[in-house]
Amino acid sequence: METCSPPVTFITYALYGIKTSPAWTLPNFEQVICSCDWGYRLIAVGAESKCDVTPQGSFVIQHGASITALVLDCGVEFCSYAFTHAENTRVPLTTEDGSVLVVPFCGWVCVGRDRCLRSMSGGVLTISWDTSQTAYISVAVYRPPTLQCHALDCTRAETTVCSTAAITDASESDPLYADQEGDQTQDQDGGHDFLETILMESDLYGTNGASALLEPCFPCLSNND
């Protein structure tokens, strides 16, 4: 059996003061809407890490037959995720104290306020509920064959391709860089937003930190003019 390479990216949320609405359930589908008083988000990419405090807000978890989606809206901190399941087996989502949901995935999409990151990587999503009104959401992303990202201003998007060979042995090829002139979105403190942190501080796709601007994650956002 082929062994997996070590995880190269971790995204972890710790959300405190959780209040949950009654779960909405259908066959092979659950949805939970929650509010939180505060929390933090930690990103670890290789030897680099970044931690941000998240203010009061809300989040939604939708757990379906083939996709699990998360939407976190904490004011200036907004992001949504969609994970494509890697296995046919499915465990229902619950918010009972001490419950844990583990979802292996084979691809994921992450959308911020102004950019979208799409990866054909595999990994594991874990959602756990503590007994003290605390929720933990952890994403472990493994080395993917391809990473795709674009700024939602589609008129500025440019294209580059990261080959599997560059990922498996980046030292044998020159890194590929997209033109970053149109990719200047930053946090209010002058630092890069968390999606840019993932792109610039990792070698997920064998480019040693280049932002790869590819076709939109959602075709309806394309500018056809």
Swiss-Prot record:
Disulphides: none
Primary localisation category: host cell
Pfam families: Herpes_UL4 (PF03277)
Subcellular location field: Host nucleus
A GO cellular component entry from the record: host cell nucleus
Keywords attached to this entry: Host nucleus
InterPro entries associated with the record: Herpes_UL4
Family: Belongs to the alphaherpesvirinae HHV-1 UL4 family.
Protein name, as recorded: Nuclear protein UL4 homolog
Organism: Equine herpesvirus 1 (strain Ab4p)
